[in-house]
């Protein structure tokens, strides 16, 4: 343990074996009904790591049936004390902590994450998420209501039922636990589809779920592709709720499928094009580093990425110059290699999309300050890229890039920058840097975003609700608000002979 309280990095695993590659239903491993498998790759080397069973509609049907059986009235899960649900989540956290090195190595090999970030940040967040949600299990309470007349009225917060959960590839394990932990804390059962690019860590945790003692059918995991397994979850008539993290385009399809099937409840955490405003009175040194990390963390593959950086005119030129200097310090390479500070993009599709957007920035007149192309001869690496003189109409200023591409735009006045910051279909996150408290509060109230950070960015914790405005999604995850998404409120009124105050 370091003096700061963070764990020291362990010796890397050199012989990691991927043991768990099947479909997990009823606490057992299954082959896919179709017999199909799909390959899983290391994006840093383009080498195949293993093959995973490819679930589709028939496998989803089996998983939903298991989840429904586990949710029946009188089942071990439904009759379990809420405090016992919490104990199981605490136990799962302990097991994840035991296997922290294995899981962090998987996230790095399969997801292209820097090992240090996977071990310290992602796995650290996983443990905090599980323990936070475990503590809530016996604190999800209803109320008594003083209704008129001789009646006794109270509310119950009941679990929604069978929840379908569709995961992204950028934070595979953290998003898996963000989804299942609040759902299980509230007493739901789940059917989870990991992203096809990054299914391995969720499948490993499936074994820990069984080891922790969760009853069969409570957690089911069906790896597969979005148009097959994901679509089957979204349209399934016996799934009561679906939660999805991913692109806005897919989020629309999921909401449409939910509406056309059984009007299942939907929680969506979608894309963003988040503005970050740096005023001339900001602490420049800190603002430079924070705005840099706000974009380049995990190769820019974060929904929170501050991908529209607005800098006040009087400090613009210096800010651009120093931002370029910072971007040029990166060391690209295999994310398991000590000293490497930038890994690969997740796959060829994302790699090509990012390079296309970089080319559009060049063609539309933005000034390329550094980077602007691929790196190396294998793996999906892209040079850290900075554009200046970016106008609001350019594609790189409007579209979510999801890559290591920073756009720095100039502004003159407070009213102007607020209007420009809000001129987007997205509304996920926003930030500002200023020493002026009045300005900070004014901007925070005016920005149309689910989270606004002041003099910091990307500060995410289990205690805080997370979600977006506009086309960045519906509902909230984590914090007390996140549990509301996994309960139904029932009003119970009982006739009594006499009511007394």
From Swiss-Prot:
Q: What reaction does this catalyse?
A: an aldehyde + NAD(+) + H2O = a carboxylate + NADH + 2 H(+); all-trans-retinal + NAD(+) + H2O = all-trans-retinoate + NADH + 2 H(+); 9-cis-retinal + NAD(+) + H2O = 9-cis-retinoate + NADH + 2 H(+); 11-cis-retinal + NAD(+) + H2O = 11-cis-retinoate + NADH + 2 H(+)
Name of the gene this protein is made from: ALDH1A1
Write out the ranges of the annotated region (Mediates interaction with PRMT3).
Answer: 336-501
Its recorded name reads Aldehyde dehydrogenase 1A1
Does the record bear Signal in its keywords? no
* A Pfam match: Aldedh
EC numbers: 1.2.1.19, 1.2.1.28, 1.2.1.3, 1.2.1.36
Site annotation (Transition state stabilizer): which residues? 170
Name the predominant localization: cytoplasm
- Which subcellular locations apply to this protein? Cytoplasm, Cytosol; Cell projection, Axon
GO terms for MF: 3-deoxyglucosone dehydrogenase activity; acetaldehyde dehydrogenase (NAD+) activity; aldehyde dehydrogenase (NAD+) activity; aminobutyraldehyde dehydrogenase (NAD+) activity; benzaldehyde dehydrogenase (NAD+) activity; NAD binding; retinal dehydrogenase activity
Originating species? Equus caballus
């Amino acid at each position: 343990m370091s003096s700061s309280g963070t764990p020291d990095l362990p010796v890397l695993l050199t012989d990691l074996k991927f043991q768990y590659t099947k479909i997990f239903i009823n606490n057992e491993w299954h082959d896919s009904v179709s017999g199909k498998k799909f390959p899983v790759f290391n994006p840093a080397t383009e080498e195949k790591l293993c093959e995973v069973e490819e679930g589709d509609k028939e496998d989803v049907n089996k998983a939903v049936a298991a989840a429904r059986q586990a949710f029946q009235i009188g089942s071990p899960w439904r009759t379990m004390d809420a405090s016992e649900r919490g104990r199981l989540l605490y136990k799962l956290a302990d097991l994840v902590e035991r296997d922290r090195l294995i899981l962090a190595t998987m996230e790095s090999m399969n997801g292209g994450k820097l090992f240090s970030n996977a071990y310290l940040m992602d796995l650290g967040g996983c443990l905090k998420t599980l323990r936070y949600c475990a503590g809530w299990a016996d604190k999800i309470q209803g109320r008594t209501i003083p209704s008129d007349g001789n009646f006794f009225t109270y509310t119950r917060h009941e679990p929604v039922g069978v929840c379908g959960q569709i995961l992204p590839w950028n934070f595979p394990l953290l998003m898996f636990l963000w989804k299942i932990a609040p759902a299980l804390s509230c007493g739901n059962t789940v059917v989870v589809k990991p992203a096809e690019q990054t299914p391995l860590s969720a499948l490993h945790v499936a074994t820990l779920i069984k080891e922790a003692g969760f009853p069969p059918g409570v957690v089911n995991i069906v790896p597969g592709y979005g148009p097959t397994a994901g679509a089957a979850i979204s349209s399934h008539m016996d799934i009561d709720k679906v939660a999805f993290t991913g692109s806005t385009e897919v989020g629309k399809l999921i909401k449409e499928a939910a509406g056309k099937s059984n009007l299942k409840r939907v929680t969506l955490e979608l894309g963003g094009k988040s503005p970050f405003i740096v005023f001339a009175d900001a602490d420049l040194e800190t603002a430079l580093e924070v705005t840099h990390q706000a974009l380049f963390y995990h190769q820019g593959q974060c929904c929170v990425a501050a991908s529209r950086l607005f800098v006040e005119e009087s400090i613009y030129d210096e800010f651009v110059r120093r931002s370029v200097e910072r971007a040029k310090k990166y060391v690209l390479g295999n994310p398991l290699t000590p000293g490497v500070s930038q890994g690969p993009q997740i796959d060829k599709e994302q790699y090509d999309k990012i390079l296309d957007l970089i080319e559009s920035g060049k063609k539309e007149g933005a000034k390329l300050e550094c980077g602007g192309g691929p790196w190396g001869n294998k793996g999906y690496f892209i040079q850290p890229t900075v554009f200046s003189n970016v106008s609001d109409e350019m594609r790189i200023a409007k579209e979510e890039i999801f890559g290591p591409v920073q756009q720095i735009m100039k502004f003159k006045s407070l009213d102007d920058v607020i209007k420009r910051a809000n001129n987007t279909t997205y509304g996920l996150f926003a930030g500002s840097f200023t020493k002026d408290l009045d300005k900070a509060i004014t901007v925070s109230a005016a920005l149309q975003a689910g989270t606004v950070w002041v003099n910091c960015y990307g500060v995410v914790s289990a205690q805080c609700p997370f979600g977006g405005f506009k086309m960045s999604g519906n509902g909230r995850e984590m914090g007390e608000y996140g549990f509301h998404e996994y309960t139904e409120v029932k009003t119970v009124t009982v006739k009594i002979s006499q009511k007394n105050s």
